[in-house]
């Protein structure tokens, strides 16, 4: 689309609205002269309110990019397949492998193995929908940006906001994991109540600042550093699982102490949402957000998503199996729910000590910090791209679109640093963990909807990966994502609801001057019944502080029915082709600014 000495844009503005075509010309000329722009909601509002859409439209000629001697920074498509895959693996193999086997076992006992299977299936479904999307629309901050092209401003702002909140909690969680595994070296990091001391809070903020600075060096430096760290993150947990499995394995643990599923179906489902399973596996999302900086994204993004999830599922499955089989009778005499490791060692290191593999304990101690360090590094970098996307959507101030000389959204990095640091002070660790899972999964529900929307809106686009049986597979993915949100419980839904209200108020404020007609309300009509239904069912249910009026089993049927109905509605409420074409024209202009002549 951008070739030769001139760039041609096809304008979506009808001939009979010349004043709107003139406004469009002004906005495109601002781009051509090096002035970044975000969407002018007022002009778009007038256009979509008054225009009768036609496809017989003129072309607008633009001269080459001129900057008046100022060198513009560009984003860099420099992440190859290995680095992209390792970005996802680093996100998945963060602090999750250190704590998730214990948390899942506490919730479900030996049936936690089933929880990993269900969770892995759910994440593969969601990843498959985004694999097709990212291959045809590889944009930076994809989780927040993709909905803009399928369902418009309100949906993209809502989903991007919830993802942004969740991403900021990820950095908080991983930093605290680093500190928890450093407690033996620096006991002053924590107070007698088990919470971070004032000195510990200061160190946590300094660590966040370090991750911010490292990401500011650019995506190429970030990718190389993460790749080196991720080799350690793969080899150590895989080696630990092999060592424990070959040292001692007690088959009785799978039948005694309450049986294979001591908490029944509810325990399995709780392990998926609040037992660390989804928190661990959802790290694949970073590939979607880094897709805008990937080489050959049409091929590399789908491959990275699938490879990373399969590799990490094998590692997590091995760790969980080893953990369950290595526990001795004294640790299980009070039941799975009371299982704990009160010493300074984490659960995996404690088990390695118990089976006599003392040589690996010191390796685990260092690897634990490296794993969390690398995951925090990835989450900070990924969230900066999401902040950039939210500025492009219009929810965040446009200064957050500014790129540094290394092509990094520097202001987005700095704002995210402040917000992530605040979570250390306002919520306890377990509530931050629950909010992380539910908010990020909520932002993912748009994937199954968008994949069908783009089958209509981008029907002729070549697809390196095609989701098989998309209507059925997409619907199933939407149902599974909805169930995961519900299983997080009523208490978490309350926190998520507060975050959504704050995001909605911010959206109203940001668009109060430009009018609200441009916000694609029709395309967002499915959000209100969906969110209200989830909140109501969560209150009626028995998970996480619910009233208990809706027992386990029937509640799954109710959530599934809600999800299917909303899914059908959401697919029908996709953007009209006219709006989609306009948004894509603006995106192409943005790409030329972000990536230079190679876009």
Regions found by a protein language model. Name each.
Residues 79, 83-96, 204-207, 244, ...:
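Hydrophobic, membrane-embedded alpha-helices of multi-pass small-molecule transporters
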Residues 139, 162-177, 281, 285-294, ...:
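Membrane-helix boundary/coupling elements in multi-pass transport proteins
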Residues 31, 39, 44, 48-78, ...:
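Terminal cytosolic tails of multi-pass membrane transporters
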Residues 199-249, 282, 305-309, 436-445, ...:
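Membrane-interface loop-to-helix entry segments
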Residues 185, 231-259, 280, 320-329, ...:
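Hydrophobic alpha-helical segments and their helix-loop junctions in multi-pass secondary transporters
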Residues 76, 81, 199-205, 295-298, ...:
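Loop-to-transmembrane helix boundary motifs in multi-pass membrane proteins
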Residues 145-148, 152, 183-190, 260, ...:
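TM-loop-TM module centered on a large, flexible mid-protein loop between adjacent transmembrane helices
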Residues 76-79, 89, 99-199, 203, ...:
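Extracellular loop-to-transmembrane helix junctions
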């Amino acid at each position: 689309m951008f070739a030769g000495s001139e760039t041609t844009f096809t304008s979506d503005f009808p001939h009979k609205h010349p004043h709107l075509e003139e406004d469009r010309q002004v906005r495109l000329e601002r781009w051509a002269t090096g002035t970044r722009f975000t969407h002018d909601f007022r002009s778009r509002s007038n256009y979509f309110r008054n225009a009768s859409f036609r496809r017989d439209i003129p072309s607008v000629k633009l001269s080459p990019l001129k900057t008046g001697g100022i060198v513009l920074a560009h984003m860099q498509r420099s992440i190859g397949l290995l680095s992209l895959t390792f970005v996802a693996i680093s996100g998945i193999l963060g602090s999750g492998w250190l704590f998730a086997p214990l948390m899942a076992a506490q919730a479900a006992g030996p049936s936690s193995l089933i929880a990993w299977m269900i969770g892995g299936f759910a994440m593969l479904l969601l990843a498959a929908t985004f694999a097709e999307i990212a291959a045809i629309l590889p944009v930076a901050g994809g989780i927040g940006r993709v909905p803009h092209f399928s369902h418009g401003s309100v949906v993209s702002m809502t989903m991007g906001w919830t993802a942004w909140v969740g991403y900021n909690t990820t950095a908080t969680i991983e930093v605290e994991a680093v500190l928890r595994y450093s407690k033996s070296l620096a006991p002053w990091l924590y107070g007698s109540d088990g919470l971070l001391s004032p000195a510990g809070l200061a160190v946590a903020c300094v660590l966040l600042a370090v991750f911010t600075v490292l990401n500011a060096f650019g995506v190429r430096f970030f990718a190389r550093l993460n790749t080196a760290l991720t080799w350690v993150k793969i080899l150590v947990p895989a080696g630990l699982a092999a060592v424990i499995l070959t040292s001692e394995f007690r088959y009785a643990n799978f039948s005694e102490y309450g049986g294979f599923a001591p908490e029944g179906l509810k325990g399995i489902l709780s392990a998926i949402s609040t037992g660390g399973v989804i928190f661990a596996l959802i790290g694949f999302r970073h590939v979607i957000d880094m897709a805008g900086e990937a080489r050959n994204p049409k091929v590399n993004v789908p491959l990275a998503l699938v490879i990373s999830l399969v590799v990490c599922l094998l590692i997590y499955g091995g760790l969980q199996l080893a953990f369950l089989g290595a526990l001795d009778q004294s640790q299980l005499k009070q039941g799975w729910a009371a299982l704990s490791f009160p010493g300074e060692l984490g659960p995996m290191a404690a088990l390695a000590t118990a089976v006599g593999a003392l040589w690996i304990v010191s390796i685990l101690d260092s690897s634990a910090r490296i794993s969390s360090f690398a995951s925090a590094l990835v989450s900070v970098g990924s969230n900066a791209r999401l902040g950039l996307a939210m500025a492009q959507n219009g929810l965040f101030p446009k200064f957050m679109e500014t790129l540094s000389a290394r092509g990094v959204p520097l202001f987005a990095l700095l704002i995210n640093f402040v917000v992530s640091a605040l979570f250390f002070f306002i919520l306890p660790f377990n509530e931050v963990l629950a909010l992380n899972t539910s908010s990020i999964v909520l932002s993912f529900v748009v994937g199954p909807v968008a994949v069908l929307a783009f089958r209509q809106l981008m029907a002729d686009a070549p697809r390196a990966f095609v989701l098989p049986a998309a209507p059925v597979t997409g619907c199933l993915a939407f149902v599974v994502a909805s169930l995961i949100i519900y299983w997080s419980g009523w208490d978490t839904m309350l926190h998520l609801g507060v975050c959504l209200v704050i995001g909605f108020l911010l959206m109203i404020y940001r668009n109060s001057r430009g009018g609200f007609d441009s916000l694609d309300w029709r395309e967002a009509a499915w959000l209100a019944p969906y969110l209200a239904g989830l909140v109501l069912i969560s209150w009626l249910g028995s998970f996480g502080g619910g009233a208990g009026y809706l027992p386990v089993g029937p509640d799954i049927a109710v959530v599934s029915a809600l999800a299917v109905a909303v899914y059908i509605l959401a697919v029908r409420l996709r953007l009209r082709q006219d709006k989609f074409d306009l948004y894509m024209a603006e995106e192409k202009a943005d790409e030329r600014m972000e990536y230079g002549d190679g876009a």
